[in-house]
A protein has these predicted regions:
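Short, solvent-exposed loop/turn segments at secondary-structure boundaries
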Residues: 47-50, 118-122
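Amphipathic alpha-helical segments in well-structured domains
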Residues: 56, 128-129
Length: 189
């Protein structure tokens, strides 16, 4: 009886090792979809705050490895002048026609909302980051998902200065976390 248990356990381990050894082959066999990630900063805060770098860093973590990422620098420069979040889908797709991607993730940072309150010894700053997200199936010219997200961050101090740029980065990171989760849920493999 003990011998039968031992043999079945060894066979089970052998099957498990064989299965785990071939898992990477299944992943490699899947054709990766190509994704164009476009981040458009329309916040009006300028380049000095590195908001675009932060956005790319956070969002690329969600898609790297699962998708083939298409270089988006040219597309971002082309779309940087105006807001395209409310634009009709055919117009936006015509702007991005030359880029070889199956899906487009269009993320637009809308203007921050800032509220300050202070008295003689206390200073409070509240910053809200608003982000518009569009996920587009470029191959079928269809919008998969569209939503606006926001994140509010507050900071208090007994000094008269709370950095606006640090508050902008904090609120942006909060909103980008939510956007990243939405991308994970709605972007097809």
């Amino acid at each position: 009886m003990k011998r039968a248990r031992y043999i079945s356990m060894v066979l089970g381990m052998l099957l498990l090792v064989t299965f785990l050894a071939n898992c990477h082959l299944v992943e490699a066999a899947r054709d990766k979809s190509s994704v164009l990630l476009v981040f458009n900063d329309q916040s009006g805060r300028g380049k000095e705050e590195r908001l675009s770098e932060i956005a790319h860093e956070v969002l690329n973590r969600k898609i790297n490895g699962l998708y083939e990422v298409v270089d988006s620098k040219q597309a971002e420069m082309r779309l940087a002048e105006d807001s395209h979040y409310e634009e009709d889908l055919p117009v936006l797709l015509s702007e991005l026609e030359e880029y070889p991607a199956t899906y487009v993730i269009y993320v637009e940072l809308l203007p921050f909302k800032q509220v300050e309150g202070f008295n003689i010894i206390w200073h409070r700053k509240k910053m809200t980051a608003n982000i518009g997200l569009r996920i587009i199936d470029k191959k079928n010219s269809k919008e998969i998902f569209r939503q606006e997200y926001n994140a509010v961050r507050e900071d208090d101090t007994d000094y008269f200065f709370v950095g606006s740029s640090s508050m902008a980065r904090k609120s942006l990171k909060g909103a980008l976390f939510t956007v990243g989760e939405a991308i994970s849920v709605h972007l097809p493999l």
